[in-house]
Amino acid sequence: MRDGDILKDKKILIVDDEPDILETLMELIDMCLIDTAPDFETAKKFLSKNTYDAAILDIMGVRGYDLLQITTQKDIPALMLTAHALSPEHLIKSIKEGAHSYVPKDKMVDIETFLSDLILAHEKGLKKHGRWFERLKPFFDKQFGPEWREADKDFWKDFDLKYMVTKEEVGDVI
């Protein structure tokens, strides 16, 4: 199944304080039914009235972590999309607080793929939804340096066990 097929008519909330980002995302996932919010209060109102298949949340400028808390309580899988909060610390915080994905705005052009992975994993009830990380690890290694996971070894060991599918597990499924 193609990413666009997975996303067709999915209800998505996009929250970002940059109008050009909202516009670009709407164009990239135009097969979805989209609500956009430029700030926390607007997003909070949408979340109180509507249900969503997923949310794309900026971190800075829109109180993204507060919105993440709301989406997590409502069982709406959230993809954190960031430029200013692009750091190992924010990546870890996003995961710990319930984000299903953490995507740099530099990789926004691939949002259809990341969002499809997220929604498919959520719909199937998959606990191991780390495909986004597999796709982005080379980017993170380049951005943060090859040893960036060493500072939080225990977190990343736990992350790998919880969210990454091993070769053996893939073999069991096939």
Language-model segment annotations:
Residues 9:
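Phosphate-coordination loops involved in phosphoryl transfer and adenosine-cofactor binding
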Residues 14-17:
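Acidic di-acidic motifs
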